[in-house]
Amino acid sequence: MMDKIDKEIWINEDKTALDPTMGAGNIIIAILYRRIVENNQNPIKAISNTYGIELDQKTHEYAKERIKKFMAHFTNEDLTKIIDHNFVCSDVFEWNITDWCPKNDKVELEGFFENA
Protein backbone atom coordinates (compact mmCIF):
# COMPACT_ATOMS: atom_id res chain seq x y z
CA MET A 1 0.00 0.00 0.00
CA MET A 2 2.84 2.41 0.79
CA ASP A 3 4.13 1.92 -2.76
CA LYS A 4 1.05 3.77 -4.02
CA ILE A 5 2.19 6.96 -2.27
CA ASP A 6 4.06 9.42 -4.50
CA LYS A 7 7.83 9.24 -3.95
CA GLU A 8 7.89 13.02 -3.38
CA ILE A 9 5.97 12.45 -0.13
CA TRP A 10 8.71 10.14 1.18
CA ILE A 11 11.49 12.55 0.23
CA ASN A 12 9.89 15.57 1.92
CA GLU A 13 11.14 15.57 5.54
CA ASP A 14 8.41 17.99 6.60
CA LYS A 15 5.52 15.64 5.75
CA THR A 16 3.95 13.89 8.72
CA ALA A 17 2.70 10.33 8.88
CA LEU A 18 0.05 8.93 11.22
CA ASP A 19 -0.99 5.37 11.93
CA PRO A 20 -4.28 5.81 13.86
CA THR A 21 -4.38 2.14 14.89
CA MET A 22 -0.69 1.33 15.20
CA GLY A 23 -0.95 -2.05 16.91
CA ALA A 24 2.54 -3.52 17.36
CA GLY A 25 4.08 -0.78 15.22
CA ASN A 26 4.60 -2.70 11.97
CA ILE A 27 3.42 0.14 9.74
CA ILE A 28 5.28 2.74 11.81
CA ILE A 29 8.52 0.80 11.41
CA ALA A 30 7.88 0.39 7.67
CA ILE A 31 7.32 4.16 7.39
CA LEU A 32 10.53 4.89 9.30
CA TYR A 33 12.46 2.37 7.19
CA ARG A 34 11.21 3.97 4.00
CA ARG A 35 12.07 7.46 5.25
CA ILE A 36 15.49 6.69 6.73
CA VAL A 37 16.91 3.83 4.68
CA GLU A 38 15.29 4.25 1.28
CA ASN A 39 15.13 8.07 1.20
CA ASN A 40 18.09 9.08 3.39
CA GLN A 41 16.07 11.21 5.79
CA ASN A 42 17.63 12.32 9.04
CA PRO A 43 16.52 9.74 11.66
CA ILE A 44 15.57 12.39 14.23
CA LYS A 45 13.52 14.32 11.68
CA ALA A 46 11.88 11.09 10.47
CA ILE A 47 10.77 9.96 13.96
CA SER A 48 9.74 13.51 14.88
CA ASN A 49 7.26 13.60 11.99
CA THR A 50 5.80 10.13 12.52
CA TYR A 51 2.84 9.56 14.84
CA GLY A 52 0.76 6.66 16.10
CA ILE A 53 -2.23 5.92 18.31
CA GLU A 54 -2.98 2.57 19.96
CA LEU A 55 -5.91 1.79 22.25
CA ASP A 56 -4.50 -1.25 24.08
CA GLN A 57 -1.91 -0.34 26.75
CA LYS A 58 0.19 -3.52 26.45
CA THR A 59 0.28 -3.34 22.67
CA HIS A 60 1.14 0.36 22.88
CA GLU A 61 4.13 -0.31 25.17
CA TYR A 62 5.27 -3.18 22.95
CA ALA A 63 5.11 -0.95 19.86
CA LYS A 64 7.14 1.79 21.55
CA GLU A 65 9.85 -0.73 22.51
CA ARG A 66 9.99 -2.04 18.94
CA ILE A 67 10.26 1.51 17.59
CA LYS A 68 13.10 2.30 20.05
CA LYS A 69 14.99 -0.85 19.02
CA PHE A 70 14.54 -0.07 15.34
CA MET A 71 15.70 3.53 15.76
CA ALA A 72 18.78 2.41 17.75
CA HIS A 73 20.21 1.19 14.42
CA PHE A 74 20.33 4.78 13.15
CA THR A 75 21.04 7.02 16.14
CA ASN A 76 22.53 6.88 19.63
CA GLU A 77 20.33 9.74 20.83
CA ASP A 78 17.77 9.12 23.56
CA LEU A 79 14.45 9.24 21.72
CA THR A 80 12.26 8.60 24.77
CA LYS A 81 10.69 12.09 24.81
CA ILE A 82 9.89 12.02 21.09
CA ILE A 83 8.53 8.47 21.20
CA ASP A 84 6.43 9.13 24.32
CA HIS A 85 5.00 12.26 22.71
CA ASN A 86 4.40 10.92 19.20
CA PHE A 87 3.09 7.44 20.01
CA VAL A 88 0.15 7.58 22.40
CA CYS A 89 -2.21 5.16 24.09
CA SER A 90 -5.69 6.49 23.39
CA ASP A 91 -8.89 5.92 21.48
CA VAL A 92 -8.38 7.58 18.10
CA PHE A 93 -11.92 9.01 18.36
CA GLU A 94 -11.03 10.70 21.66
CA TRP A 95 -7.79 12.23 20.39
CA ASN A 96 -7.42 15.67 18.82
CA ILE A 97 -5.11 14.84 15.93
CA THR A 98 -4.66 18.47 14.87
CA ASP A 99 -3.40 19.64 18.29
CA TRP A 100 -2.00 16.19 19.27
CA CYS A 101 -3.72 16.08 22.64
CA PRO A 102 -6.81 14.48 24.21
CA LYS A 103 -10.11 15.98 23.12
CA ASN A 104 -11.83 18.19 25.64
CA ASP A 105 -15.59 17.66 25.50
CA LYS A 106 -16.27 21.14 26.88
CA VAL A 107 -14.29 22.80 24.09
CA GLU A 108 -15.92 20.54 21.49
CA LEU A 109 -19.40 21.71 22.61
CA GLU A 110 -18.61 25.43 22.97
CA GLY A 111 -20.77 27.37 20.55
CA PHE A 112 -22.83 24.32 19.61
CA PHE A 113 -26.06 25.74 21.02
CA GLU A 114 -25.43 29.41 20.20
CA ASN A 115 -27.12 29.28 16.79
CA ALA A 116 -29.93 26.91 17.83
Residue positions per predicted region:
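SAM-dependent methyltransferase catalytic region
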Residues: 2-116
